[in-house]
């Protein structure tokens, strides 16, 4: 395809197409299907927390009238405000009139093309915002990109945060003991009426932690043994082998001791230009190596009540007191046929009902 050259309008050059530069959207946590959708009809919601008193029974004389009794359940209530997001986009005649479609020599752009790009931009912004909020919920807090704290799940549920130090800079570190500590904590603190059994423990870690873990002298051989296609199939039951069949290689995933370690490099930029690294711990340097552990209960489907995301109704008359949806997008024509406005609304709040199962991991030694 020929078009005018940059050097002179009297010369021609080939136009080969359009190259779009789009920031990464990541989405690992969203793709897990970890958070169960829980639509509500209001913009705030309450949650009752019931503590059961379950203890062993003492034997009594069958001829006596003595019997065991249980203490009544203790019930308390906590509240959560919903987070509201609104995005506005517009199409004006100036975006269409005389505008060449990128990647073409002389084709004019169309309203349909511009509309599709606007809607894709809205959806992408929503998706990365939701991924950011999901990751914050896995850290035990409900916080937006500005740093506004809506809820500290540890304080709300009256539990303490657990941190496990792997001491990966020490060649003699007992990594098996650290993993066992993690697994036992999950089992002891689940409080679901049963143990965490069959649910895979996920640990999303940053690049530094993953590198230190897989290069540790006690771990290196186990990691290398998993990098062959046959080993991967035996471990996961998947026929995907990596680069040979066009599927992303699993070089950043490592199973060990019943735990799945995944290197997650997700990061997003907010409107102020600040970059938010998803796998991070406040006040901990990025040279330390950190991660966040949680039980992957996605396979439970609707039975999963550990990770949920509440969606509230759109602030429009026709949607008052109706069950909320993930995202509402409305299209309005401007007065005097001067363009089109798009409005996107979302009330949402991801949360964890058992934040004691959210564990931070660090590559350094405790007190280091």
Curated annotation (Swiss-Prot):
It comes from the Viruses. It is found in: Virion; Host cytoplasm. The keyword Ribosomal protein does not apply. Keywords: Capsid protein, Host cytoplasm, Late protein, Virion. Its main location: virion. The keyword Metal-binding does not apply. Transmembrane segments: none annotated. It holds the Pfam family Phage_cap_E. One of its GO terms (cellular component) is viral capsid. Assembles to form an icosahedral capsid. The assembly is primed by the interaction between capsid assembly protease and portal dodecamer, and major capsid proteins assemble cooperatively to form the procapsid with the help of capsid scaffolding protein. Major capsid protein forms hexons and pentons of the icosahedron. Viral genomic DNA is packaged into the procapsid through the portal vertex. The packaging triggers a dramatic reconfiguration of the capsid shell. Homomultimer. Belongs to the lambda phage major capsid protein family. This is Major capsid protein.
């Amino acid at each position: 395809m020929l078009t005018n050259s940059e050097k002179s309008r009297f010369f021609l050059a080939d136009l080969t197409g359009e190259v779009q530069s789009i920031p990464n959207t990541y989405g690992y946590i969203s793709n897990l299907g970890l958070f169960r959708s829980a639509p509500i009809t209001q913009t705030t919601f309450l949650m009752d927390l019931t503590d059961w008193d379950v203890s062993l029974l003492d034997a009594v004389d069958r001829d006596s009238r003595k019997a065991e009794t249980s203490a009544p359940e203790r019930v308390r209530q906590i509240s959560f405000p919903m987070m509201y997001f609104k995005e506005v986009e517009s199409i004006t005649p100036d975006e269409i009139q005389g505008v060449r479609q990128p990647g073409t020599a002389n084709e004019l752009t169309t309203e349909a093309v511009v509309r599709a790009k606007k809607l894709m931009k809205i959806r992408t912004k929503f998706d990365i915002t939701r991924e950011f909020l999901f990751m914050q919920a896995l850290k035990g807090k409900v916080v937006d990109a500005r740093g506004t704290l809506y809820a500290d799940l540890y304080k709300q549920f009256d539990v303490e945060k657990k941190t496990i130090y792997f001491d990966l800079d020490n060649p003699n570190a007992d990594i098996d003991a650290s993993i066992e500590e993690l697994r036992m904590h999950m089992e002891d603190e689940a409080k679901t009426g049963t143990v965490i059994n069959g649910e895979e423990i996920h640990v999303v870690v940053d690049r530094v932690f993953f590198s230190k873990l897989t290069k540790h002298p006690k771990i290196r051989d186990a990691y290398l043994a998993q990098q062959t296609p046959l080993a991967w199939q035996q471990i996961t039951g998947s026929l995907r082998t990596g680069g040979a069949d066009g599927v992303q290689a699993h070089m950043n995933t490592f199973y060990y001791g019943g735990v799945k370690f995944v290197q997650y490099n997700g990061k997003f930029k907010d409107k102020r230009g600040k970059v938010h690294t998803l796998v991070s711990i406040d006040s901990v340097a990025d040279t330390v190596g950190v991660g966040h552990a949680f039980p992957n209960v996605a396979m439970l489907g609707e039975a999963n009540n550990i990770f949920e995301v509440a969606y509230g109704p759109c602030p429009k008359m026709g949607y008052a007191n109706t069950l909320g949806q993930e995202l509402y997008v409305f299209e309005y024509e401007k007065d005097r046929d001067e363009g089109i406005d798009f409005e996107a609304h979302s009330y949402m709040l991801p949360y964890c009902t058992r934040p004691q199962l959210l564990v931070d991991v660090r590559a350094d030694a405790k007190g280091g």
